[in-house]
Regions:
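N-terminal phosphate-binding or glycine-rich loops at protein starts, especially the Walker A/P-loop
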Residues: 6-79
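N-terminal beta-loop-helix "entrance" segment that forms/cooperates
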Residues: 73-98, 254-256
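Glycine-rich phosphate/diphosphate-binding loop of Rossmann-like nucleotide-binding domains
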Residues: 45-61, 67, 177-251, 264
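N-terminal glycine-rich phosphate/adenylate-binding segment common to multiple enzyme folds
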Residues: 88-183, 273-275
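Generic secondary-structure signature for well-ordered alpha-helical cores
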Residues: 65, 69, 107-110, 137-144, ...
């Protein structure tokens, strides 16, 4: 290794440290969460993304428009279509989110977002950052909330994944020091840990969840994971009515499939990378990632999405119209709840449970032997009408 190589790596590391320090200062200066009741109009952005994204997002927006028809007609809610968050536009701009698209996103209060394609090794695309990661950072969507519920198995879990720090914070900014040595970085701040922990404990208290589990690998990754664990535990001390326990990520993945132990879990707090992995595992219990929605919450903005990818193969094979919208519809339930429409959120959630697990009049297979995305949307709205009568 040459002195020039060391100097180059140090300069890049210094730039990363300064940028993350500035971000930490901005977190300290933030105000409180937005009060949707005080708004004259709530603007819901509808951003289709890539692959099957436009299909399932359009269908979910159609269901939302049906449920919110009275508020739309009264001028209290507006749907705004944002069409530019595609891999082609992002590559053309050489940015994870083109500037004009980001401005459109910032003009909304909440965003319903379809899956986007993230370039990886071997793809024809340049190495631009994940649009999801970029959006979470740009809009400071610090909490990723993913519920998993399977009543017959005693599963009622809610995952709070820290969204803007950890191993993903500077995921495209690692340093190739030499041909033989590459380094990536993990970011943990006091402010980031404190706010995700408070959100999780507040949720646990409001929803009568008696246990919060903090998931790390602090026995090995002692500095960043250790900081995350200690600060979350410190917040937990302010909630004596809630039991706090701590688990290592590896044993947690095992205990989720332990039929006796998994019933004890209620609310989880996890750093970014662990949360991404374990929530996909958890989603399998209720039918896979195609059935699971996700909320990304910040103090000013919120974004709601499916947790699966853009499925480009379905598009190439001409099967996009058969894509499963359930993940986006589950995300829509959380969107409704977030903007204060809890009654309509409960109504949509009940309709989805009937369509997916009870009545099951239509079956989604992703192919011609199943129903189309649009047909399933009609089925959900028909079910909403029936249970509203």
């Amino acid at each position: 290794m040459t002195e020039a190589q060391v100097k180059n790596a140090v300069e890049k590391f210094e730039a990363l440290i300064r940028a993350q320090s500035d971000r930490s200062d901005k977190i300290k200066a933030q105000g409180d969460f937005i009060d949707f009741k005080s708004l004259d109009k709530i603007i819901i952005g509808v951003c289709g993304g890539d692959g099957i994204g436009p299909v399932i997002t359009k269908e979910s927006a159609r269901v939302l428009e049906y449920l919110l028809d009275d508020k739309v007609k009264a001028g209290k809610i507006e749907f705004k279509v944002i069409a530019g968050l595609t891999i082609e536009n992002r590559v053309k701009a050489n940015k994870a989110i083109p500037d004009d698209v980001l401005e459109e996103l910032k003009s909304c209060h909440v965003i319903l977002k379809g899956p986007t394609t993230t370039p990886q090794a071997g793809d024809p695309w340049p190495n631009i950052e994940s649009a999801n990661v970029a959006m979470r950072k740009a809009l400071d969507l610090f909490a990723n909330l993913r519920p998993v519920k399977v009543p017959e198995q005693g599963i009622d879990w809610t995952f709070f994944r820290e969204n803007t720090e950890g191993a993903y914070a500077v995921g495209s900014m690692g340093v190739n020091v030499t041909d033989d040595l590459a380094l990536d970085f993990v970011v943990t701040t006091s402010e980031g840990c404190d706010r995700i922990a408070r959100l999780a404990y507040d949720y646990a208290r409001r929803n009568n969840k008696g246990r919060v589990s903090i998931i790390t690998k602090a026995n090995v990754i002692k500095t960043t994971d250790g900081k995350f664990l200690n600060l979350c535990k410190k917040v937990g001390e302010e909630y004596p009515d809630i039991v706090t326990d701590e688990w290592y990520i590896d044993i947690t993945t095992a205990k989720l499939i332990d039929e006796k132990r998994r019933r004890d879990f209620k609310v989880f707090i996890l750093p970014n990378l662990y949360g991404d992995i374990i929530t996909d595992e958890a989603a399998e219990f209720q039918g896979g990632v195609g059935t699971a929605g996700s909320a990304n919450i910040g103090k000013r903005y919120a974004m709601f999405e499916a947790i699966h990818g853009s499925a480009p193969r379905m598009v190439r094979e001409g099967r996009a119209q058969y894509a499963d919208p359930c993940s986006m519809l589950r995300a829509s339930v959380m969107l409704l709840s977030h903007i204060g429409e809890q009654e309509k959120a409960d109504l949509l959630e009940r309709a989805l449970d009937i369509c997916m697990y009870e009545d099951k009049k239509l079956k989604i297979t992703g192919r011609e032997d199943g129903c189309t995305c649009s047909e399933f949307g009609d089925y959900v709205m028909e079910t909403v009408r029936k249970i509203s009568e």
